[in-house]
Structures are given as structure tokens and as C-alpha cells.
Swiss-Prot record:
This is Putative antitoxin MJ0975. InterPro entries: AF2212-like, AF2212-like_dom_sf. The gene is vapB2. The keyword Zinc does not apply. It holds the Pfam family AF2212-like. Belongs to the UPF0165 family. It comes from the Archaea. Keywords: Toxin-antitoxin system. Possibly the antitoxin component of a type II toxin-antitoxin (TA) system. Its cognate toxin is VapC2 (Potential).
Length: 64
């Protein structure tokens, strides 16, 4: 059985964002996959397609 749960790392502890139902003493394997910046910031800014294209072009050109 595979379960995917978002978590946050704070003060040396990995905290799950939702509870999971596992039996006491159950051993698990954890695979850490950091969220991409695009996933963390999705929906925060309202940008037009033109603005997004300009930002991407600026990044690709090294900020020029």
C-alpha cells in the first residue's frame, strides 16, 4: 500500500500535514521530494500570459 502525504520540515522534525492510519510500530520508507517553486506559489499572483512569457524570457536570458 502506497500513501502520499504532504509534510513540512520544522525545527528538525518532519511533520505530516494530515494524519495517516498506520498500526503502532509500523516501519515505513520515506522518499523526500521537495516541492517545485511553481507548485508552492501557484495561484498567489495573478499574471497575464504576456507577463509570464516576459518573466520566463528574462530568466532564460540571465536577467538581461
Amino acid at each position: 500500500m502506497e500513501i502520499v502525504v504532504d509534510a513540512i520540515y520544522e525545527k528538525g522534525v518532519l511533520k505530516l500535514k494530515k494524519s495517516i492510519n498506520l498500526p503502532e510500530g509500523c516501519e515505513v520508507e520515506i522518499k523526500i521530494i521537495p516541492k517545485k517553486i511553481s507548485e508552492k506559489t501557484f495561484g498567489i499572483l495573478k499574471l497575464s500570459d504576456k507577463e509570464i512569457k516576459e518573466i520566463l524570457e528574462e530568466i532564460e536570458n540571465g536577467g538581461e
